Amino acid sequence: MTMNSFERRNKIIQLVNEQGTVLVQDLAGVFAASEATIRADLRFLEQKGVVTRFHGGAAKIMSGNSETETQEVGFKERFQLASAPKNRIAQAAVKMIHEGMTDPTHVIWTQA
């Protein structure tokens, strides 16, 4: 079954709302669409104010009042944002890190 762009974009919105973040590569597989098509969909959805894009994917826009929007995003929110790419980075990095070479960043924390 193929979806038109309207249906695909609505499903992308649903996935972003459920998961918090989505990756272009994963969406291309789910919808049997090219990565270029998915990137165009995400660009369109960002222009409509539905998602915010990051390299390789998109995330749910954090809602809140103007006071919280100006505050820095906390550790928990940063940790959850783009967690799949961070996990892949952590898996690759853990092979290169030896005892005494780490610091307390959120990417390193995912290795634990």
Curated annotation (Swiss-Prot):
SMART domains: HTH_DEOR (SM00420). Signal peptide: none annotated. Residues 22-41 bind DNA. One of its GO terms (molecular function) is DNA binding. Keywords: DNA-binding, Repressor, Transcription, Transcription regulation. InterPro entries: Carb_Metab_HTH_regulators, DeoR_HTH, Tscrpt_reg_HTH_DeoR_CS, WH-like_DNA-bd_sf, WH_DNA-bd_sf. Repressor of the gat operon for galacticol transport and metabolism. In K12 strains the operon is constitutively expressed because this gene is inactive. This is Putative galactitol utilization operon repressor. It comes from Escherichia coli (strain K12). The lineage of its organism: Bacteria, Pseudomonadati, Pseudomonadota, Gammaproteobacteria, Enterobacterales.
